[in-house]
């Protein structure tokens, strides 16, 4: 049965992303992001709506299209575009980003579209972990560089530009290779990028996070990555985990999971099984394909798997509110997330339960889902004061609770949380400080500038993710005058962060730092002027070519 067709205009790309929810299908097919609706539930879409138009603004490699549709913990739709770029206009915003791949997010109706992260080449799939962290594995450019495991953070730039693909001299791929932009973090690396966590795989395609039921417990908190190398003999699926490292993570337990299959995608069914799509063989279109269903007979038959299947196959709208609260601690993340979303639809009637779980609950994941749900309600109802009782949690004993509170305060525009966020900038956990700085950037209090300066000085460029969060904080809180006022600060780490902030603001005042005593700061200012570009500052950049004290 054909659910919908006709996606074959001259501009149409590969249909490369699907998300199904409540008899609606979100379908990614350049140049549109579509929403299809099967109103009478007969297996055919009666209506279709283009939520956005303008993805894929130029010719690029086959498959560098629109894909990766998934739901975030905030109830928003996240998706990716390869380096064919975009120029999209909605009633809310116009986004022009033609020269790299990107991650975007929006509400399920397409509103409030945001450019979430940039500088990617072709991030095929996105996956959230149990704590709301977003990851992708981005493809290499076949010139000695390697694919990258990317912790996707808001405002992050991974460094790729499509023009690099066509540079052969003096070095293939230009700055991508010569400046080692695809390498994990090392001292002296370009500071405007958020570096990858690791170089893994050769042809990353499908990526999925284990939901918590169906496999042996050793796979808890693991990702599964399809590695497409053109031949089944050398292709397959890896599993790996990430462990906390500063404000971000490091990779661990990287192992082959299923091998000798030209897998393109992997997903988890609701009854404990895994579904894997198989290209069969070769790089050319083979005109055939297979889908395998794989399962562990012992794990598949346990009570938690059967319970998760029953819940996900039914309707949570029929569950009492208290029962939904208990499901927030279920071992299957999909059950927890759907229970959270159902509680959100019940709006303020579910507030007492969510607050009780968030503040007094004993299960960490249930508390986190309750915090996310409260954040959703605060945003949807435009009543940030819903979060007032959560202020007590900034001193919670658990780092993750403090981090999620900081995160939700910014996302919900909770202005009363500014003082709490300033305190969290001094938290012993870099992850907590990361979210506090990022949220201050969203709330824009100018009296937080000095606190952010202190954070950046203390970090002293050691943690690039924390530096990025400090920059995002300054982008929202600091005007150019305040930034230039600290232009002679003894901390070169702070001066570097100011350059990065001015780069994001695309402000010609960045040229002031072409005379900085630290060559690393000068280099970053030069990159900002040339790469962005900031045309007004190009003459000042050209004038330093005669300086002999620069590398």
Language-model regions, residue ranges each:
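Alpha-solenoid HEAT/ARM repeat scaffold
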Residues: 336-337, 365-368, 403-404, 419, ...
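Hydrophobic alpha-helical scaffolding
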Residues: 93, 116, 139, 193-198, ...
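Core register positions within helices of long alpha-helical scaffolds
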Residues: 342-345, 373-376, 408-411, 415, ...
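C-terminal substrate/ligand-recognition segments
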Residues: 267-272, 317-318, 328-346, 372-379, ...
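Hydrophobic core positions within HEAT/HEAT-like alpha-solenoid repeats
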Residues: 325, 340, 355, 371, ...
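Amphipathic alpha-helical scaffolding segments comprising HEAT/armadillo-like alpha-solenoid repeats
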Residues: 317-326, 347-359, 379-395, 413-426, ...
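Alpha-helix N-cap/helix-start positions at coil->helix boundaries
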Residues: 333-334, 363-365, 399-400, 415, ...
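Beta-propeller domains with acidic blade repeats across secreted/periplasmic ectodomains
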Residues: 1-323, 344
